[in-house]
Amino acid sequence: MRIASFFTVLLTLLTLNITPASAERIRDLVNIQGVRGNALIGYGLVVGLDGSGDQTMQTPFTTQSLTNMLSQLGITVPAGTNMQLKNVAAVMVTAELPPFGRTGQNIDIVVSSLGNAKSLRGGTLLMTPLKGVDNQVYALAQGNVLVGGAGASAGGSSVQVNQLAGGRISNGAVIERELPSTFGTSNTIMLQLKNDDFSMAQKVSDAINRSGYGGTASPLDSRTIQVLAPHGNSSQVRFLADVQNIEVNVGIQDAKVVINSRTGSVVMNRDVTLDSCAIAQGNLSVTINQQANVSQPNTPFGGGQTVVTPQTEISVQQTGGVLQRVNSSANLNNVVRALNSLGATPMELMSILQAMQSAGCLRAKLEII
């Protein structure tokens, strides 16, 4: 009885030390080759702005675009007319044509100011053709622009929250032309992993072959899995619906630290670990202060000249860093606690993480975006 209890306790302890492997569906791991969106772009005008449009003297293309649009509507602007408009803005319109997009389907669009308009709030986008890379028109956009920012100005002072020079129009474009599709015409489908990994490519292939489709899937490289599929659109839709819901044991993910060099943000996943190391971080600041000294002659009629001489002061301040020990950390909570103990700013932490990886103390892949 005691032996049975001992083995029960031992089995429980071993179970607690096992890292559970998560399972994900194939639809979350792969993309289907050829099933993707296509970028659309167009140039248009936003009208109805409350005095926050382009300054036409500095953006002549806005006036030219408005003149061309009016001429298409049968309105002739006299030659040499200097239109001082404040409620019109030239904009670029972007959208994505979804895969299998059909004629008459609505898509979202993004409107961005091209000139020096202060705000697009309250404006209306006039009919704008959206073209693809082949210079063909695939959609027409029009509607009221929704701007997420807010701002006000008076007496030379201004307050602004978020940006006002761009906005969105939900369902603001209508598809007028469809892209030809080759879906269903071939007996092979290429599944592309979102992250290249030889082991994951083999796992996805094995999972498909074990799920009643034996011999249909084979990995071609670290990103592509070739799958034999039935011919025809309806048959391939049913086949992919089954394949995409197959679960794959993804196991332990690669440890990764992502650094945004523009914003200074640092993001790391739960598999990041640290080895023991010692770190000293010092700061060097250089301050340059320049003032203009004006020297005038004492006698106004003595023929002297007023001379402006610059006076420059340069100061250098260096603060030494104390050598600090960073203990080995086996989980994310300990990693965060160890890095916070350094008291470094996010920008300093970026340099520290790079140095730790070079020294072999950071057990993770460092990616800078």
From Swiss-Prot:
Pfam hit, one: FlgI
BP term (GO), one: bacterial-type flagellum-dependent cell motility
Signal in keyword set: yes
Which residues, by range, are in coiled-coil regions? none
Q: What is its main location?
A: periplasm
Source domain of life: Bacteria
Cellular compartments annotated: Periplasm; Bacterial flagellum basal body
Quote one Gene Ontology molecular function term. Answer: structural molecule activity
Its subunit composition reads: The basal body constitutes a major portion of the flagellar organelle and consists of four rings (L,P,S, and M) mounted on a central rod.
Q: What is this protein called?
A: Flagellar P-ring protein
Q: What organism, scientifically named, is this protein from?
A: Pectobacterium atrosepticum (strain SCRI 1043 / ATCC BAA-672) (Erwinia carotovora subsp. atroseptica)
